[in-house]
Amino acid sequence: MKFISWNVNGLRAVVGKGFAEIFASLDADFFCLQETKMQAGQLDLAFDGYESYWNYADKKGYSGTAIFTKHTPLSVTYGLGIDEHDHEGRVITLEMPDFYLVTCYPPNSQDGLRRLDYRMTWEDDFRVYLQGLDAKKPVIVCGDLNVAHKEIDLKNPKTNRKNAGFTDEEREKMTTLLGAGFTDSFRFFYPDLTDAYSWWSYRFRAREKNAGWRIDYFLVSNRLADKMASATIHNEIFGSDHCPVELVLND
């Protein structure tokens, strides 16, 4: 069973850059998107054999998530059920017979770390939400988690220590989340692999130089780890400042 996650940084723009062909070539069972940056009715996008679920931000052209699936879920939940967090289209949960699939786009701490305090609250509430699901059945979490966990996960750790996405506070929240019973699928297979990134700034020819960050993840409940077949970063796929990431589970 194949899962794809991609921060498209504006779905309408990516549709004009070959999204349909990329979607078809990856042939995922579940294809999760973050930063769709659109409202209901702005794009008529459907694929044969797939159902789709969308969570839009109240603010136009901002955030937003979506999931395309070949498998009809038992239920669909939008957001965390906490009003403070549920106006930016950041979370969709599909309940499947044997697992939950959660795609998410946590809030960026922003320049000057002006949203760091809110990000800390969001992280704590999101972890509690995931633990509640995990108590019922295993969980697969994917998305642009807006944090590079370890120094190995970005090209220039020393110069980014106090920047959004690599603060000690954000990294510690990721450590806490993993400690709550989750496995980072990519590091499970490649614990020491360097220069493996999923996001590159549009500035300074960063992608050409592979001066990137690994901030797009698949996390799985620890008890699913032995069912993982592969984890892949598709850095050959363009169209966004992020590339898609993939998880394959044995059926």
Q: Could you describe each region identified by the protein language model?
A:
Residues E51, D125-A211, I215:
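Metal-dependent phosphoesterases centered on the DNase I-like endonuclease/exonuclease/phosphatase
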Residues N7, F23-G41, L101, L130-E151, ...:
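Active-site beta-strand/loop signature of hydrolases that rely on acidic residues for catalysis
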Residues K60-S75, F204-D226:
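Conserved beta strand-loop-helix elements of the APE1-like EEP
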Residues K37, Q42-S109:
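Structured beta-strand-rich core segments of catalytic domains in phosphoester-bond hydrolases
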Residues K70, L94-P97, S221-N222, L247-D251:
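Active-site beta-strand termini and strand-to-loop segments that position acidic
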